[in-house]
């Protein structure tokens, strides 16, 4: 009887401790519009959440809400600011006008790899260039994609003149300007809807890195892939500032230890590897054609698109921002990585 009573007390005590630990765990909702099985959601965000959870020793429980369940692509910034989500992974270019200097990475032919773009973005943030546009949120980290190539449904493109009249997806403001200067008709379609838009003929093609092909099943609706390194995009893992400030110092440190260059460099390594993997897979698919634009054709693109940089610098100047300094610093960092 005595042993039974002691066993009961120990069991109740253990259950109480477990319940207390669960009660003390702080849940953080991490939102993304990417499908649950897409590369970013499953290999970057879920892995980051697992790492933070493990390092917090149960103090944090980051849960990923994928597929836009907490808000669609253009709403990711708003749901973090409004507290619907605690953290969000978002395309900064989707949020009109909020992140002007961060759009430097979108300029034509600036980057080739995620490693270079991500290093440049986090360096710009560390050195204070992006302080104004990041005010009001806790920035966990930034990264870019590898350079965007053209992925087409039925029309093979190579020269700048080949785009005239084609319906092309516009992933950002600068990409829209690029496509307009090439004579294409820009169509705004959220990334998850690209495959369906191509299938229905709403789009003839889209600029995307190879990483997006598997995530959005583009291999089923495209067959021509032309490499030009035309543009890029800036992505941010952002957190509600009040939520971050409410955390105990030890849990803030866990977030901080997985932020900035640590996050950006780690994510970029995975992204560049996935880009190479998906390109190899596409190359092995029957009926798919990959073409690399030769240097003389690239020079034609550069000649047509050259005014975009000057226009961007003028736009930054009009906003009272030092675009010249940001572009110069971005180029320095990118050159140190991409060569």
Where does each model-flagged region fall?
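N-terminal secretory/targeting leader peptides
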Residues: 24-117, 125, 132-339
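N-terminal signal peptide c-region/cleavage motif recognized by signal peptidases
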Residues: 14-19
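Serine/threonine-rich, low-complexity intrinsically disordered segments
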Residues: 6, 20-21
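Bacterial N-terminal signal peptides that target proteins for export
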Residues: 1-8
């Amino acid at each position: 009887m005595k042993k039974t009573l002691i066993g009961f007390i120990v069991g109740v005590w253990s259950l109480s401790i477990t319940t207390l630990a669960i009660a003390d765990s702080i849940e953080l909702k991490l939102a993304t519009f990417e499908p649950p099985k897409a590369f970013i959601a499953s290999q970057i965000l879920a892995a980051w959440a697992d790492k933070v959870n493990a390092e917090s020793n149960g103090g944090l429980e980051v849960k990923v809400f994928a597929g836009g369940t907490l808000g669609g692509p253009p709403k990711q910034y708003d749901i973090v600011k409004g507290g619907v989500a605690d953290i969000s992974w978002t395309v900064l270019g989707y949020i009109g006008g909020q992140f002007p200097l961060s759009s430097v990475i979108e300029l034509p032919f600036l980057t080739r790899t995620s490693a270079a773009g991500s290093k440049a973005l986090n360096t710009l943030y560390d050195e204070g260039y992006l302080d104004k546009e990041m005010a009001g949120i806790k920035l966990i980290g930034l990264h870019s994609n590898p350079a965007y190539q053209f992925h087409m449904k039925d029309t093979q493109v190579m020269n700048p003149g080949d785009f005239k009249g084609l319906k092309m997806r516009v992933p950002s403001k600068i990409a829209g300007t690029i496509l307009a200067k090439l004579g294409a008709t820009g169509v705004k379609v959220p990334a998850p809807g690209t495959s369906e838009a191509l299938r229905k003929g709403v789009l003839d093609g889209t600029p995307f890195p190879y990483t997006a092909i598997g995530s959005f099943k583009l291999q089923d609706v495209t067959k021509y892939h032309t490499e030009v390194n035309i543009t890029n995009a800036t992505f941010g893992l952002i957190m509600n500032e009040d939520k971050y400030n409410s955390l105990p110092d030890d849990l803030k440190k866990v977030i901080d230890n997985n932020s900035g260059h640590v996050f950006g460099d780690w994510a970029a390594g995975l992204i560049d590897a996935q880009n190479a993997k998906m390109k190899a897979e596409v190359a092995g698919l029957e009926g798919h054609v990959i073409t690399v634009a030769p240097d003389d054709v690239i020079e034609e693109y550069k000649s047509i698109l050259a005014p975009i940089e000057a226009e961007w610098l003028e736009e930054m100047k009009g906003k009272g921002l030092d675009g010249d300094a940001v572009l110069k610093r971005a180029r320095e960092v990118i050159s140190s990585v991409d060569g």
